[in-house]
Amino acid sequence: MKNSNRFSYSRRKFSRHLFISATAMSAAPILLPGIAQAQSSTSLKIGIIGSGRIGGSVGLRWAEAGHEILFSSRNPDQLNDLVTQAGPKARAGYPQEAAEFGDIVFVAVPYAATPQVGRDYGALMQGKIVIDCGNPYIQRDGEMAAVALEKGTGVASAEFLPGVKLVRAFNALSWVEVNEEAHRDGELIAIPIAGDDQEAVAVATQLVIDAGFDPVIVGGLDKAGLFDQGTAVYVKGMTAREMRAELGL
């Protein structure tokens, strides 16, 4: 099937991306105890907090790649169709269950809810890799969005979610692109990634590949503002080559 061929192609590309990220971020090797094997063949347990359009769409792509997914909502019974579509390795639960379940936690909530996620589930996520894809919109999220955009969303999210291995990713493309452009023919759509923890960045890199996209490592969390909403690379459907050129990488 053509999707599996593209997936194999993306897997081959991962070693090149990981080498580049390790070289750029540190001269020391990246050691991924417990998760290193998952990057070759083992499925990861991923808890998704916020299973709406983007959380649900990305979760489906990860389920297709063989990962175990716990979609969550305050009304998990409403996620039955999503779980059925995702297959036998997926289930639904409450956000607390997702925070407990996941080796990786994907936070896909309206940005104004991010501080509450930290307050409610931060203790359960301590030391875990957390991928944050929320975007602050002033019209929807109010003054806190303006503050987050001024700081850069990576820096702001780190304040809301202390003690986790935070990565910013999956915020700079739409849920429509996730559904329609994953594993497409030719050059894949790029997804920018920013994070301070090398292990977390490496795992997020693999998860971008698993979802059917091309990872572009931009730098630490202080660089995540380069792909915040309103920037030149936000929801532009760029290839990795185009994105690197735009960002000067």
Predicted regions and their residues:
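N-terminal secretory signal peptides and thylakoid transit peptides that target proteins
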Residues: 1-25
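C-terminal segment of N-terminal export signals and the immediately downstream linker at the start
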Residues: 30-65, 70, 74-79, 89, ...
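Active-site phosphate/pyrophosphate- and oxyanion-stabilizing loops and adjacent acidic/basic residues
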Residues: 80, 119, 155-156
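Rossmann-like NAD(P)-binding element
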Residues: 87-89, 95-129, 134-140
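Internal alpha-helical scaffold of NAD(P)-dependent oxidoreductase catalytic cores
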Residues: 93, 160-166, 184-224, 228-229, ...
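Rossmann-fold NAD(P)-binding glycine/threonine-rich loop
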Residues: 134-167, 172, 182
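Rossmann-like dinucleotide/flavin-binding elements
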Residues: 174-178
